[in-house]
Swiss-Prot record:
GO CC, one annotated term: nucleus
Species annotation: Mus musculus
Modified residues (Phosphoserine): 154, 157, 279
Annotated protein name in UniProt: Insulin gene enhancer protein ISL-2
Alphabetic keyword roster: Developmental protein, DNA-binding, Homeobox, LIM domain, Metal-binding, Nucleus, Phosphoprotein, Repeat, Zinc
Region (LIM-binding domain (LID)): 272-301
Amino acid sequence: MVDIIFHYPFLGAMGDHSKKKPGTAMCVGCGSQIHDQFILRVSPDLEWHAACLKCAECSQYLDETCTCFVRDGKTYCKRDYVRLFGIKCAQCQVGFSSSDLVMRARDSVYHIECFRCSVCSRQLLPGDEFSLREHELLCRADHGLLLERAAAGSPRSPGPLPGARGLHLPDAGSGRQPSLRTHVHKQAEKTTRVRTVLNEKQLHTLRTCYAANPRPDALMKEQLVEMTGLSPRVIRVWFQNKRCKDKKKSILMKQLQQQQHSDKASLQGLTGTPLVAGSPIRHENAVQGSAVEVQTYQPPWKALSEFALQSDLDQPAFQQLVSFSESGSLGNSSGSDVTSLSSQLPDTPNSMVPSPVET
């Protein structure tokens, strides 16, 4: 918290901060005496010039309008202090806001969306069992699978994980380390051991118990030993193998479902809306609109050319029509000349009368 204090400067000799006289104010930032009218004080007893109190990272001036943080003798604004020294998510390394809900695992803090298994990426919900291994979250199924692989892959490694067993050597009483040849020989004996064959009744009993609880406790295993007549080791190995097979099967089914979903949603690598092609149609039928009747004026020379193309021409009348057209007196002649000329022409439809035609 930054406070502004009205200061009356003390006109005394400047001295050390530890030996300052009553009424003097020494700036923590520059170490000189403060003669300004106002002093910026940071709780509990740190006093600054107004020009000296600023963030050590972004050089933003700090006053009573913002929050000031002091760490190792340096002042920071709230944004830089949270970025540098605030608690961050152990998964995404992003800070938290005051409204975020978090999940804690020992000393690590996670966002709710980041609290997932590092193997199968399944989100861990409240009530789920998980393990924290080298700052990585593991769900119960993946943790058990990891223990099984460690037990099968490195049986003689120092500090075995729970559930892992080493090789049983005949000369276990001797404290000497077995030679490399003996170790290879024992490995060969392990690969050629006799497999345990289960009958139908034993298999049905184990499957029924597995459907009820894939991870039976010690009491349930003792009951299975009495019911099936098998050794505890055979029952434990059968449950381990069954869980491993179901895990692989579920992963394979999930991959197949994702592949089918991606095949349906994409076409040759391009994602879009699927369309169905229809039958081909004529172009004019596809044009939408209403028919419009267009009327044009037919000039006189067109009627004259149509009259000239007729086969049964009356030569005297045609010669008179041609001479009449060439004289150019169609528009200047009297009405009687036009009437007499029309009476001499053969009776043909639309010979000289302009009529509207459809185009």
